[in-house]
């Protein structure tokens, strides 16, 4: 069946699947299920309440919350009312959230709890267009922020008056209508509001559906933030389109335990997650056996996205009998462009273009894409839109090549390309992936643009360093230990020995603490913010070139 919009899709699936479980989530420490009927009723109530509150088609509604069932219900409710969801990552500071919501012109805002409500109150004067705030947690409700439960009840009570209008709005919504504005977290510069239509998101969910196994009852354990397009499409909308059970991990920290309890068939993650799980397994005598056990007895599908997956990680999983595959996409493409399938894959590749997507490589190596999932443009930024949407193609900003079998290989970001003072060009991600292949290296970022050699900021795997060198002391103490510096220099030299001379890291800064989204040095999808890291370590890096 072809669907005109996401609201119609959800209502149809909820009616078709009825008592079957749609969501599984923890309540007071125990997992409980929400049926498709309950899910559909809640979405309808949310949409009704928004209409009764005066929300018009095309109005923007903000969503500032952690992953939880209410996030999905609010998302679908906003769109069922014909409005546009503007999600903010839960960890975003109040001032940053205010900038995004003000730019989008949000008129209503959903928040999850007291902490998020405090952010909203802190910047409320900067958001005069906000007419109301709804808080999911009943305990955090206040006169200026009514509780979610009461909001839904008002929606149910109003259905006698709003039902016909909801049906009219659903009928009027087309694939060209705006569904969401998703602000890119951005590794550099200010975030841009990516305008995705109902057609963009529906087409991508349909395209991904072709890869879903037909012989298994899918249980997908979701943990990546829904404010990021990877989880929003590949977990949320994919589960609605395919009609399978979406289980919620309690948190990223509890994910290993949640896997054992839920016993999922599918998990999606970013490279950092797969690396950490592999590192944990390698602490035991039989890593492949331990790694298999860590993902439960029912696992059928592990998909990596959000950033390039180092080939060594993929090989280790496949050697353990785990079907880890890599895909590629961007927020601007809703997001999936390519997928490795279980039947057709290349370890080093990001896979083949999904049905309906065309790819080509520009003369300078940039990957270009077109298809029904490519965004409408950037909100209020026509010049930025014109720069990336040209002659019917979306210019991804990524570099790569396509082999004779149609597999895409990502080699780096165009803007990250390092040009040394001798004119030699280096793709930093390639060097970084080699460094990360050493178990003693936790994180690494390479620099050297317009310099005469490469340098890096390296975060060691301190547990492994302590074990190998039989050392004690804090991370900060070890970072200053000459024995550690000498050891790591030998490791780096050995790792890069087979690379070209200009691709070798001559000197580096040893950093005791990891890069994180909280430190402002990674995006929410765990991509390095190179400029932020360089700024923080500018003095140390400059000294390396002065020595």
Regions found by a protein language model. Give the residues of each.
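Conserved AMP-binding/adenylate-forming core of the ANL superfamily
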Residues: 23-72, 76, 93-98, 147-156, ...
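Structural core segment of the AMP-binding/adenylate-forming
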Residues: 52-53, 80-154, 487
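Conserved C-terminal "lid"/linker of ANL adenylate-forming enzymes
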Residues: 443-446, 490-547
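Conserved pre-ATP/AMP-binding loop-to-beta segment of ANL
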Residues: 19-21, 135, 153-183, 190, ...
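Gly/Ser/Thr-rich phosphate-binding loop
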Residues: 265-269, 277-345, 358, 442
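Conserved AMP-binding/adenylation subdomain of ANL enzymes
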Residues: 202-222, 226-290, 298
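Conserved ATP-binding/catalytic segment of the ANL
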Residues: 353-420, 425
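Conserved AMP-binding A3 loop
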Residues: 33-37, 179-205
């Amino acid at each position: 069946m072809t669907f005109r919009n996401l609201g119609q899709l959800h209502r149809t699936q909820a009616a078709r699947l009825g008592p079957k479980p749609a969501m599984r989530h923890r309540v007071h420490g125990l997992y409980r299920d929400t049926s498709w009927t309950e899910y559909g009723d809640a979405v309808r109530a949310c949409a009704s309440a928004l209409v009764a509150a005066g929300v018009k088609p095309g109005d923007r509604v903000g969503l500032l919350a952690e992953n939880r069932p209410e996030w999905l219900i609010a998302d679908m409710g906003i769109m069922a009312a014909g409005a546009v969801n503007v999600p903010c990552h839960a960890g975003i500071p109040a001032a940053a959230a205010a900038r995004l919501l003000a730019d989008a012109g949000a008129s209503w805002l959903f928040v999850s709890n007291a902490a998020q409500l405090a952010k909203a109150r802190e910047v409320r004067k900067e958001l005069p267009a906000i007419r109301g705030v709804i808080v999911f947690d009943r305990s955090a409700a206040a006169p200026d922020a009514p509780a979610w439960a009461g909001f839904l009840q008002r929606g149910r009570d109003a259905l006698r008056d709003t039902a016909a209008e909801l049906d009219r709005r659903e009928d009027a919504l087309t694939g060209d209508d705006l569904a969401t504005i998703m602000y890119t977290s951005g590794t550099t510069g200010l975030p841009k509001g990516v305008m995705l239509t109902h057609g963009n998101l529906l087409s991508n969910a349909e395209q991904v559906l072709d890869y879903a196994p037909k012989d298994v009852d899918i249980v997908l354990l979701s943990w990546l933030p829904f404010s990021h397009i990877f989880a929003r499409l590949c977990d949320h909308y994919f589960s609605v389109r395919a009609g399978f059970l979406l289980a919620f991990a309690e948190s990223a920290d509890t994910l290993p335990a949640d896997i054992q309890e839920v016993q999922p068939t599918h998990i999606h993650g970013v490279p950092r997650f797969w690396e950490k799980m592999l590192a944990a397994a390698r602490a035991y005598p039989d890593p492949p056996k331990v790694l298999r056990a860590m993902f439960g007895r029912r696992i059928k599908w592990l998909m990596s996205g959000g950033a390039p997956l180092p080939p060594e990680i993929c090989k280790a999983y496949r050697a353990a009998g785990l079907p880890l595959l890599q895909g590629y996409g961007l927020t601007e493409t809703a997001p999936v462009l390519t997928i490795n399938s279980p039947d057709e894959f290349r370890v080093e590749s990001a896979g083949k273009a999904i049905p309906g997507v065309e790819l080509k490589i520009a003369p300078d190596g940039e990957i270009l894409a077109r298809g029904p999932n490519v965004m409408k443009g950037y909100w209020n930024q026509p010049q930025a839109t014109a720069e990336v949407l040209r002659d019917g193609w979306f210019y991804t900003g990524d570099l790569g090549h396509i082999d004779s079998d149609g597999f895409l290989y990502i080699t780096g970001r165009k803007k990250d390309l390092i040009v040394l003072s001798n004119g030699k060009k280096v793709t930093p991600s390639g060097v970084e992936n080699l460094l990360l292949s050493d178990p003693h290296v936790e994180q690494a970022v390479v620099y050297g643009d317009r310099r005469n050699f490469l340098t890096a900021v390296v975060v060691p795997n301190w547990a492994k360093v302590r074990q190998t060198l039989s050392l004690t002391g804090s991370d900060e103490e070890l970072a200053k230990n000459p024995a550690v510096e000498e050891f790591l220099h030998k490791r780096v030299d050995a790792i890069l020995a087979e690379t070209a001379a200009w691709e070798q890291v001559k000197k580096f800064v040893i950093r005791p603490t990891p890069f994180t989204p909280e430190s402002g040095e990674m995006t929410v999808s765990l991509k390095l913010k190179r400029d932020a890291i360089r700024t923080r370590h500018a003095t140390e890096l400059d000294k390396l070139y002065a020595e």
